[in-house]
Amino acid sequence: LFAPEREGANGRPVCSVVCIKRKNKTTTPKEENKMSKKVFIGVGHGGSDSGAVGYIVEKKANLVMALACRDYLVAHGVEVRMSRTKDEEDPINEEVRECNAYNPDLAIDVHNNSGGGDGFEVYHTLNGGTGKVLAQNIEKQVIKIGQNSRGCKTRQGQRGDYYAFVRDTKCPAVICEGVFVDTKADAAQAGTKAKQQAFGIAYAKGILDTLGFKYDTAASTKPAEPETDAETQAAITKVQRAAGLSGKTVQYLLDYEYVVELVRKLAAAMK
């Protein structure tokens, strides 16, 4: 779910304005591409801002999708910078600042939705242009992985485009809302890491289509996994040992979003 501006609007949650010292989050292709392009990926919410919460937690799903998108793009010769690569504060004004400083050819902001709806939607600028083409190309790829679409959309605000990421970025930019996390059937479309990664790869293919890059539709790359914080890893180890579970079984269970939270609660209850 996308938080629009620093002041907030229409009762939506706001992102705090935080000054953050960031590590380099730019990933450069291993081999130089003569048509080298740059893409910025905003990863919605993070840290104390969980985003929408339902059958899945938005900030976590956003990161899995974004990492998969990044890795697929890099594998096809695109340089990528992400607003975050782990669970940390990521206010929208900082995303916009980083994006403009990076000066990419295209930008996307990865989010998931709430409000009881169903399906994917993508927002682009009122001015259309390349941003609209990018939105349409991403939508086509998302439909191919089995998710229905609510359409390519715009939203009018007092300053033109309502959403800051679309309005204030200098390059063509879109906001992707993968699923509604509070609708059971729709959340199931992104209910595992593998399914979340499929969304990220679909976004990447839409970006490549817009850039005019060719890609092997049958090829697959193994996306990076989000970093597991020390507290969560300790809880996983504690429960695994107590239950006598194999590493393979644990990894299978952890593919489901709700299991991670369950493991934390079990570990806390164990003496």
What are these regions (language model features)?
Residues 37-54, 108:
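Catalytic-core environment of secreted peptidases
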Residues 37-38, 60-222:
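Active-site-proximal helix/loop segments of hydrolytic enzymes
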Residues 9-34:
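Short, Lys/Arg-enriched N-terminal segments with co-localized hydrophobic residues
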